[in-house]
Regions:
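Residue-level detector of conserved, well-ordered beta-strand and adjacent loop positions
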Residues: 35, 64, 140, 205, ...
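Extracellular repeat-rich scaffold modules on cell surfaces
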Residues: 229, 233-307
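Acidic, glycine-rich calcium-binding repeat modules characteristic of RTX/beta-roll
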Residues: 74-84, 107-125, 131, 143-167, ...
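Low-complexity acidic/polar repeat-biased segments
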Residues: 163, 250-251, 260, 268, ...
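Acidic glycine-/aspartate-rich tracts in secreted/extracellular proteins
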Residues: 38-41, 68, 99-103, 144-146, ...
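Metzincin-family zinc-dependent endopeptidase catalytic domain
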Residues: 2-150, 156, 208-212, 216-254
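Extracytoplasmic and endomembrane cell-envelope/extracellular-matrix remodeling and assembly machinery
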Residues: 155-199, 208, 212, 216-231, ...
């Protein structure tokens, strides 16, 4: 029951859909029904649901109890959030409110996921750009068969989606509109740091406050990417994963839009800050004004396109990737000339330097793009690379 309640809350948190508990009343206003079945009635499936418009059973959600409990009601498998079996409840509820599998054509011959056909292997084929898989959508059957390095290759008690994926969120918002008031405070999203029961992936839909993804307790390298899912024909359609190395779990960030126009940012779902840990981390910003703090280790910090970013590498040999574009400005607060490097994706001759009190201003074609605090000179040969941004 709690998993179904959590599933309903998860859908309401991101969309305009709301659920009202009418108890056991059997009347025409009831849109969703929940049942438990045994193995014989469920035909061996984990569960099933009837989508709107199917027949008189539309809105029915059935869970095969025998897949989860023994005959004396003892648990067979973990159903903790993030477990292989735990996602069934959210998966089936999504069907009941109108979402289909990416690999099939639904009731009315809707398009399959890009790159899939009726001959595709529904358990292994992740489609175009490998996005038909966890952690990008929980409606897929490509979970432990994804082999993408983000999720386990067996039915584990951790490592899979705990929530809707970014692609699921977009589909629900297209149907029901967005929830513009979700997580509107100052939120901190802490990276999971171990492969233990109940850990897994979450897609963030956060519409307010100054927020941060935090990996400060990590002993292993972390990647924190503040960019939103693109929903485009690319390998970031379902999001840019943020996680600790070797851990199956972390975050993606849902597409930032108003539920109507995919091509324009609504400025709602924005995560502003990132904090690394004690190893060599990779921190990537977005179009907002970001504060990126690498802490220990040899870190890479990239403020992204747009905004006034503040970059702090911390101890170690750090790289600061500086975007040369109008409207984007990075302040590097702790550049260590004997250790650190700047990286640009433009030619050396397009850049110039000028002193500003105790700081050094960097300009691209006379447009200010960066300020090095407490630095009075720069050695172009040893402290600067013009290799571009590899791996973005």
């Amino acid at each position: 029951r709690q998993l179904l309640l959590d599933a309903m809350q998860g859908i309401a948190d991101v969309s305009g859909l709301r659920f009202i508990d009418r108890g056991d009343n059997n009347d025409d206003n009831v849109e969703l029904w929940f049942y438990t079945l045994d193995r014989r009635d469920a035909d061996g499936s984990y569960g099933f649901a009837y989508t709107p418009g199917s027949d008189f059973d539309e809105g029915l959600v059935a869970i095969n109890r025998s897949m989860y409990q023994t005959s004396d009601f003892k648990p067979k498998h973990s159903i903790a959030p993030g477990s292989f079996y735990g996602i069934t409840f959210l998966h089936e509820l999504c069907h009941a409110v109108g979402l289909k599998h990416p690999h099939d054509s639904g009731l009315k011959q809707q398009p399959r996921f890009p790159g899939l056909t009726r001959r595709s292997n529904q358990y292994r084929d992740s489609g175009m750009f490998n996005q038909n898989a966890h952690p990008f959508t929980q409606l897929t059957y490509v979970d432990k068969g994804a082999r993408n390095g983000y999720v386990p290759t067996a039915a584990a008690d951790h490592g899979f989606l705990q929530t809707l994926g970014a692609l699921d969120i977009a589909a629900l918002q297209w149907l029901y509109g967005i929830n513009p008031n979700a997580s509107s405070g100052r939120d901190v999203y802490r990276l999971p740091l171990s492969n233990t029961e109940g850990m897994g992936w979450r897609a963030i839909w956060d519409t307010g406050g100054i927020d941060r993804i935090d990996g400060s307790l990590a002993e292993m390298p972390v990647t924190i990417d503040l960019r939103n899912a693109t929903l485009g024909q690319d390998d970031a359609a379902g999001g840019y994963p943020s996680s600790a190395e070797g851990v199956f779990g972390g975050f993606t960030i849902a597409h930032d839009w108003n539920g109507v126009d995919l091509t324009e940012s609504a400025g709602l779902c924005i995560i502003e800050h990132a904090t690394g840990g004690r190893a060599g981390d990779r921190l990537i910003g977005n179009q907002a004004s970001n504060r990126l703090r690498g802490r220990r280790g040899d870190d890479v910090l990239y403020g992204g396109l747009g905004g006034k970013d503040r970059l702090v590498g911390g101890p170690g040999r750090d790289q600061f990737w500086i975007e040369a574009v109008s409207g984007s400005f990075a302040t590097v607060r702790d550049f260590q000339p004997e250790l650190d490097q700047l990286v640009f994706d433009v030619p050396r001759e397009s850049l110039s330097l000028s002193s500003q009190a105790d700081d050094l201003l960097i300009q691209w074609r006379d447009i200010p793009i960066a300020l090095l605090k407490g630095v009075d000179s720069l050695d172009w040969s040893s402290q600067v690379l013009f290799s571009g941004f590899q791996g973005l």
